[in-house]
From Swiss-Prot:
Gene Ontology CC terms: cytosol
Top-level taxon in the UniProt lineage: Bacteria
Residues of the signal peptide: none
Intrachain S-S bonds: none
Residues that coordinate or bind [4Fe-4S] cluster 1: C41, C77, C111
Protein's job: Catalyzes the methylthiolation of an aspartic acid residue of ribosomal protein uS12.
MTTase N-terminal domain segment(s): 32-148
UniProt feature coiled coil, ranges: none
Domain Radical SAM core: 173-403
Protein name as catalogued: Ribosomal protein uS12 methylthiotransferase RimO
GO MF terms, alphabetically ordered: 4 iron, 4 sulfur cluster binding; aspartic acid methylthiotransferase activity; metal ion binding; protein methylthiotransferase activity
Length: 477
């Protein structure tokens, strides 16, 4: 899970000297200064950006620290125990500042707010407003009412949307050269361990033309890499068109000249057919990278998880993707300690990972989610056993990842430069086509030729000169 430093946007109005900084002289509306804490997945980050866009358009001014803020928006994650703990810690930190008189209001939004609703207000009565996932379009009215002197707590919880919410009105908080693009909301999968459908509702897809318009806007604003996200990317279109339409969408996205890289996240093994693989293999802008969370490899565990797949089917799809897409890099996630997992099941998982050799892999220990079928399953696994299995799996994956990075030394790869290295002259941080933002390794790039400066946002050919575990060292050519 990530907590992002949210920086002020360049297009906000700055108070004129001698005027009340809380009133916009042009609109007469209240204009408070606000800070944001954004937690959780990239899909939640897009929601954060959408709320910021609405606040900015209404005259509120974002600042880069809570020290200079009148109010704070905490956009929470409620996915697993560790995410909930992180969200509660962030809320408590902001409420402490409010009690000390350093913040006027604390607004809590997102998945934890949606999941707990009144329980959260009972536990933290100092929260001024609670906004659920589908109330985010009303963030301005919530803040306006707080500034008008409303004393009661404000809550906005709406039913899951049946039409997609537009993300066009966004204030980007990622570096300007990459952005996440959400193509759908919610999920129709009924995985027994997962509470996302309870927080995000059923799957609904944006129209293709709306996604293309949002992508073009991103490209025209200077975005070089667009990262496609959804709860279930390959299910795109089923609700709207009656059949999967990811293939058609990707063909249209691949035509956008202003975008260099398109990256695909959250693939589900179902609906990956030959036509889609052909598109992935032949596209000019879609990078050879697929994030496909598989969760397990034991048929017994997959059945108990209601994944509607088998180890054999997963092996077949991994092999087919690798054989058809040149230089494909794959990322997946696994769960250890799911109820009923035996040592034999775990050995099957280890064997599958050894066989598949995913370049990037994350592991979670099972987290009990209230009101999910898995929470009622017998044969709970001891948390220490689940943690030991996680560590064993990560030790195996570490060797696979390190071997893969070692094999890249001496080659030349294009690197998207994300940032300057703090306190080191002429050293930069970037990623190749093989690394997604926030979750994969980094490339440390040295500028060798002073007459050919490296700049943030460039896609720069670099020679890989050394491996440092999960990360690489490179020299700009």
């Amino acid at each position: 899970m990530m907590q992002l430093p949210i920086l002020p946007q360049n297009n906000v109005t700055v108070a004129t000297p001698g005027t009340d900084p809380m009133i916009d002289p042009e609109t007469g509306k209240p204009r408070g200064r606000y800070a944001v804490v954004s937690l959780g997945c990239p899909k939640n980050l897009v929601d954060t950006e959408q709320m910021l866009g609405r606040l900015d358009a209404d005259g509120y001014r974002m600042v880069d620290s809570v020290d200079g803020a009148d109010f704070v928006v905490v956009n929470t994650c409620g996915f697993i125990d560790s995410a909930r703990d992180e969200s509660m810690a962030a809320i408590d930190e902001m409420l402490a500042l409010k009690r000390d008189g350093k913040l006027r209001n604390v607004v809590v939004t997102g998945c934890l707010a949606e999941r707990q609703q009144d329980k959260l207000l009972q536990a933290r009565p100092d929260i001024d407003a609670l906004v659920g996932v589908f109330g985010r379009n009303d963030i301005v009215s919530v803040v306006d009412e707080l500034y008008s002197g409303l004393q009661e707590q404000r809550t906005i919880f709406k039913p899951a949307a049946v039409n997609p919410l537009s993300d066009a009105m966004r204030s980007a908080v990622t570096p300007r050269h990459f952005a996440y693009l959400k193509i759908s909301e919610g999920c129709d999968r009924l995985c027994t361990f997962c509470a996302i459908p309870k927080m995000r509702g059923k799957h609904f897809s944006k129209p293709i033309e709306q996604i293309i318009d949002e992508a073009k806007r991103l490209g025209d604003s200077g975005v070089r890499e667009v990262v496609i996200v959804a709860q279930d990317t390959t299910y795109y279109g089923m609700d709207r068109y009656g059949e999967p339409r990811l293939n058609q969408l990707l063909k249209e996205l691949d035509k956008i000249e202003s975008i260099d890289w398109i990256r695909l996240m959250y693939f589900y093994p179902m609906y990956i057919d030959d036509a889609l693989i052909d598109t992935l293999a032949s596209a000019r802008r879609i990078v050879p990278y697929i994030d496909m969370p598989l969760q397990h490899a034991s048929d017994k565990m997959l059945k108990r998880m209601a994944r509607k797949t088998t180890r054999s089917l997963q092996t077949d799809i991994v092999q087919k993707l690798r054989s058809r897409i040149d230089s494909l890099v794959m990322r997946t996630t696994m769960i250890t300690g799911f109820p009923g997992e035996t040592e034999e099941d775990f050995v099957e998982l280890m064997d599958f990972v050894q066989e598949s050799r995913f370049e990037n892999l994350g592991v979670f220990t099972y987290s009990i989610e209230e009101d999910t079928p898995a929470a009622r399953l017998p044969n709970r696994v001891d948390p220490e056993v689940a943690a030991r299995r996680r560590d064993d799996l990560m030790e195996l994956q570490q060797q696979i990842a390190f071997d893969w990075n070692d094999s890249r030394v001496g080659g030349t790869e294009e690197v998207l430069i994300d940032a300057e290295m703090p306190e080191q002259d002429n050293v930069f941080i970037g990623r190749t086509r093989s690394e997604a933002p926030d979750v994969d390794g980094l490339i440390y790039v040295s500028q060798v030729d002073p007459d050919s400066p490296v700049e943030v946002g460039q896609i720069r050919p670099c020679e890989i000169v050394a491996s440092q575990g999960y990360d690489l060292v490179a020299a700009a050519t």
